[in-house]
Amino acid sequence: GFPPRRRLLRSAVTKLKIKQKEALGVAEKKGGRRGPGSVIGSSAAGCVCALLSVYNVGGGAFAELWTLGFVASFCTKLSDTVSSEIGKAYGRTTYLVTTFKVVPRGTEGAVSVEGTLAGIVASTFLAGIGYILGQVNLPQGVLCVLASQIANFGESLIGATLQDKEGFEWLNNDVVNVVNISAGAVLAALMQQLLVSWRS
């Protein structure tokens, strides 16, 4: 199904150049194996959307939005993971999103061209799977990709400005993941509603 494909790809990119990442101190802990907090954070938004869809909350008018949010949430997470891991492994230059100063790989709130492009490709791939499976149509697939990139940029801003700062010790990666992925789902749904309103 949909989530297993995401897990396989995520696991593969996490292990890319793992020795190099470990030497630089930017590798995921436990060889990339996710703990309970990470699993919950990564799947919470998707699970909520799935439950809302299963129980037909809001009726038929909302059914399409819940499915769209489901797909967008996983597109956002996969894009986030792929961009981060590819950036750590192959990013030539890493920039802080707030100042565009060059910073070391793995810095919170930093991005690279290689990682960003890989994240867009990953999100597009997963949106394409959603389209093939009939979960989203083509315009909705595009919205999933757009929403994932906006949400991931927001996550980078949070990482650069708040994470690891005094008073925000509670804002760990798991919490940021929940915010990021939920934002991707909500943004896709909002953009869909705006698109429908504009067409009508």
Show where each model-derived region lies:
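Hydrophobic alpha-helical transmembrane segments
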Residues: G1-S200
